[in-house]
From Swiss-Prot:
It comes from Arabidopsis thaliana (Mouse-ear cress). This is OVARIAN TUMOR DOMAIN-containing deubiquitinating enzyme 3. Keywords: Hydrolase, Ubl conjugation pathway. It catalyses: Thiol-dependent hydrolysis of ester, thioester, amide, peptide and isopeptide bonds formed by the C-terminal Gly of ubiquitin (a 76-residue protein attached to proteins as an intracellular targeting signal). Belongs to the peptidase C85 family. Gene3D superfamilies: 3.90.70.80. CDD domains: OTU_plant_OTU3-like. Optimum pH is 7. Residues 224-229 are annotated as: His-loop. Residues 154-164 are annotated as: Variable-loop. The active site is at D84, C87, H229. The keyword Hydrolase applies.
Length: 234
């Protein structure tokens, strides 16, 4: 039981911090559904249709870890971000401004970060119709808390952003985002190299293209440097 709890906690931590993404898998067959105890899953993961029990569960999406790009160490400068609970949002607004050749002053950075936070709240909490466009984010949110609880907390400046907010903002802003970790945290021989390893990408569909409705935006690169803190890479 302790081993199972530890494993579940590890998965939840990866999802909260953006290291993992949900891949929804369902099984309408009794042989599979019955083998998974409903007591081990949140109630929101289970539904019944025409007598069949459908079990929806999270599978870690490790596509970046399998890709050649994920094996490559990349070098960037670290732009430190204030750790006041807004770090994810601050890093994003700084990165988007930097890509446009704009430098934000401290007050503008804070205000823009708070606007991003409230944009997440607006589409997820205040507009049920819009909410349906962000199903992956909804699953990431409700894996360990209710939507109501999330909506009570997201408006607070000290509520950290993570996986669900990245899923929303990459789509809402049509902004490609890649999250990195320091090279030494990737377990490469236990060394402390100066590079960074990409672990997850959001909004890849907005990285380029031509034609009506297409965008070609520069990537915003975020460094997850532990303890729920994000900095900007550039």
């Amino acid at each position: 039981m302790e081993l199972k709890s530890s494993s579940n906690n590890n998965i939840l931590e990866q999802l909260r911090n953006g290291f993992a993404r949900f891949e929804l898998v369902s099984s309408p067959t009794a042989s599979v559904s019955d083998s998974i105890s409903s007591t081990s899953l949140p109630a929101s993961f289970i539904s019944t249709t025409k007598g069949n029990s459908y079990v929806f569960f999270a599978r870690i999406n490790s596509s970046m870890n399998r890709s050649p790009a994920a094996k490559k160490v990349e070098k960037y400068a670290v732009d430190r971000v204030k750790g006041d609970g807004r770090c994810l949002f601050r890093a994003l607004v700084k990165g988007m401004a930097f890509n446009k050749g704009i430098t934000l002053n401290p007050q503008r950075e804070r205000d823009d970060a708070d606007e991003l936070r409230m944009a997440v709240k607006e589409v997820i909490c205040n507009d049920p119709k819009e909410r349906e466009k962000y199903k992956e984010a909804l699953v990431a949110i409700t894996v360990d808390e209710s939507l109501k609880r999330f909506c009570q907390r997201i408006g607070r400046h000290d509520f950290w952003g993570g996986e669900s907010e990245l899923l929303v903002l990459s789509k809402l802003c049509k902004q490609p985002i890649i999250v990195y970790i320091p090279e030494h945290e990737h377990g490469r021989g236990g060394g402390y190299g100066p590079g960074f390893i990409p672990i997850q990408e959001y909004g890849s569909e907005f990285r380029g293209g031509w034609g009506k409705g297409k965008t070609n935006k520069n990537v915003v690169r975020l460094l997850y440097s532990g303890r729920n803190h994000y900095d900007l890479l550039r």
